[in-house]
């Protein structure tokens, strides 16, 4: 019997040019991936031009804005952008909102208030998509008698929130339709986050909730080669995303505890990586099993099933290495061999282009 698998999607990072995104979008649609999630952080490539180009190039694959932060995209602008992209794509947009990376938001010269920012953004965006005239006074963002001057194609467009800390996860359950679990979060953390979100959603009487997990992935016929590629990807993410210094946010301490990696080991690994040592020499297999999918296609599928067991409905995979389209196609073919009747989590052609 085939394993219970999550949906498989692609995450397109900001290191990719719009032209590269278009090529990957065509490949993803041809091989049946569910969604293209476009990642945006301050000061990298803005995602909206690539999303628009990919919307025009494709007809089935969904397009995830994952994520827009309200400090750079005011909530009124998020509603405008999401609605117009939904028009362009024929209703294929999936909206993700997050508070952004604290250190980078600080560079904008604005006060970082993640809970307030998420709350205000969801309230304003929902009202505008419903074609309401929104007057809202928030702690971070406000709107005064604002209405879209056109009707959004889907007034009930689902909203996913990127959240990590416990209070943000609880907020996500109360207000949103889905959670985006960030990179560098092991399965045990995902299980814990899912429990917090679903408990909060139940209290708010929200019945359905979608869990999307971001993960780097390396799938190759040579499993050892794939694991080395994955180490380089995880190493780059640790350098970019893990806080410097010793004063780590509580959620990072929780992630570390649930990964099985001791704090001194992580501190030592970060120091060596930041001094330029190659990740293949620094990181052992625990960093790969905790923070990536890696190996042959069959091994990656087994690892993906583990995330499904802890509550992830969808994996948005960043394919590491020099040939992401080929590696993604290799994995897709293996999934289709495993579930040959076409009823597979990876296939979008049998379902309508709604939120997923």
Language model segments and positions:
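Short, acidic/polar
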Residues: 16-28, 78-81, 161-171, 230-233, ...
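N-terminal beta1-alpha1-beta2 module of alpha/beta enzyme domains
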Residues: 1-65, 157, 348-350
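Hydrophobic faces of well-ordered beta-strands that scaffold small-molecule active sites
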Residues: 6-12, 36-38, 63-66, 93-97, ...
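An alpha-helical appendage that flanks or caps ligand/catalytic pockets
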Residues: 2, 111-148, 190, 199-309, ...
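Alpha-helix-loop-beta-strand connector modules within alpha/beta enzyme cores
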Residues: 45-68, 72, 121-124, 128, ...
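Active-site mouth loops of central-metabolism enzymes
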Residues: 6-19, 68-76, 153-164, 217-220, ...
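Conserved, mostly hydrophobic/aromatic
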Residues: 28, 32, 54, 85, ...
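Glycine-rich, proline-tolerant flexible connector loops at the mouths of alpha/beta enzymes
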Residues: 35-57, 69, 101, 105, ...
